[in-house]
């Protein structure tokens, strides 16, 4: 098969960094360098160039899709002769642990809320929908946090279903990385946002990923646009270990941290533990449950060293 034929048979349009950056068109930069610094994760160098060349074109594309969706809703209301309920546009962001999903989500939230329409953008992570530690311990699943079995999928599906049904307000549980658990009675109220960004490991999964739990609808059924943040496996491992070491010098030093006992470890021992955690838990979850969902995404962003995106694939 020729290169031309292979490009024609893929469901994705492919853009290198320069090609994608050109699609920004004339969209203005609405974030200052100080604001960008606040949005980046502990393990990332998020530059103003990265926002301009990768995230501004993406926010422009999403604004087109969202506007089109609103026009479609208006057509339906005109046909029915009703003033319809406010239905949020849902964007999901999936990918491995340590790939930078949270930073992508925060940057998109900031950019989309600054478009002239001043849309209200909520950000929810699916970590809150993990079963509490007490339940995971009872079921012997503490070493499988993030695997399909560790989530309260019924509650997560009900959350997105209620939003898509026009509910006035819904609640989402909140996860604390400090205590490594869902916060008891710490639910967040979500009141009819224009856009919901849902970030998590499992947001592209479907019935094929839950043979043990045969329910009929999934988060992906309610998502309007899905993003998969991708990177080579060796970089993911490097970023995971590096993040662990930074936490060891920062968050883990808090006496209330679930991982406080790691704070005093010598660096070589900490690297060994981080590597073990990566291979035994996070790499397994990536290979078995996360990576197989990549080709379901509307858009795939592939990162290289320094967390810089160098390839974007957009579903035709």
From Swiss-Prot:
EC class of the enzyme, as a word: transferase
Catalytic activity: (R)-pantothenate + ATP = (R)-4'-phosphopantothenate + ADP + H(+)
Kinase listed as a keyword: yes
Coiled coil ranges: none
Pathway terms, separated by semicolons: Cofactor biosynthesis; coenzyme A biosynthesis; CoA from (R)-pantothenate: step 1/5
Location (main, coarse): cytoplasm
One MF term in the entry's GO annotations: ATP binding
Annotated CDD domains: PanK (cd02025)
EC number: 2.7.1.33
InterPro entries from the UniProt entry: P-loop_NTPase, PanK, PRK/URK
Keywords per UniProt: ATP-binding, Coenzyme A biosynthesis, Cytoplasm, Kinase, Nucleotide-binding, Transferase
Any one GO CC term of the record: cytoplasm
Annotated binding of ATP, by residue: 95-102
Matching Gene3D superfamilies: P-loop containing nucleotide triphosphate hydrolases (3.40.50.300)
Location of the protein in the cell: Cytoplasm
Gene Ontology biological process: coenzyme A biosynthetic process
Family under the similarity heading: Belongs to the prokaryotic pantothenate kinase family.
HAMAP family registered for this protein in UniProt: Pantothen_kinase_1
NCBIfam families per record: panK_bact
Protein name as annotated: Pantothenate kinase
Organism: Erwinia tasmaniensis (strain DSM 17950 / CFBP 7177 / CIP 109463 / NCPPB 4357 / Et1/99)
């Amino acid at each position: 098969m020729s290169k031309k034929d292979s490009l024609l048979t893929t469901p994705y349009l492919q853009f290198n960094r320069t090609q994608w950056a050109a699609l920004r068109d004339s969209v203005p930069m609405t974030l200052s360098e100080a604001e960008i610094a606040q949005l980046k994760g502990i393990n990332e160098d998020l530059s103003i160039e990265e926002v301009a060349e990768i995230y501004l074109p993406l926010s422009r594309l999403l604004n087109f899709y969202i506007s089109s969706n609103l026009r479609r809703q208006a057509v339906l209301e005109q046909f029915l002769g009703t003033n319809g309920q406010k239905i949020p546009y849902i964007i999901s962001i999936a990918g491995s642990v340590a790939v930078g999903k949270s930073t992508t989500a925060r940057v998109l939230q900031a950019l989309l809320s600054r478009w002239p329409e001043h849309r209200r953008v909520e950000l929810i992570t699916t970590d809150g929908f993990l079963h509490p530690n007490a339940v995971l311990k009872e079921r012997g699943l503490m070493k499988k946090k993030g695997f399909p079995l560790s989530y309260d999928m019924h509650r997560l599906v009900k959350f997105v279903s209620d939003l898509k049904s026009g509910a006035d307000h819904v609640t989402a549980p909140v996860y604390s990385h400090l205590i490594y658990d869902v916060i008891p009675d710490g639910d967040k109220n979500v009141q009819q946002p224009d856009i919901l960004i849902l970030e998590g490991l499992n947001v592209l999964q479907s019935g094929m990923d839950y043979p043990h739990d045969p329910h009929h609808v999934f988060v992906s059924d309610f998502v309007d646009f899905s993003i998969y943040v991708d990177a080579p496996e060796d970089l993911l491992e490097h970023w995971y270990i590096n993040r662990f070491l930074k936490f060891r010098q920062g968050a883990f030093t808090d006496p209330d941290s679930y991982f406080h006992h790691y704070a005093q470890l010598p660096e070589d021992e900490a690297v060994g533990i981080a590597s073990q955690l990566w291979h035994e838990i996070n790499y397994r979850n990536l290979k078995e449950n996360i990576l197989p969902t990549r080709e379901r995404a509307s858009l795939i962003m592939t990162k290289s060293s320094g967390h810089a995106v160098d390839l974007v694939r957009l579903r035709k």
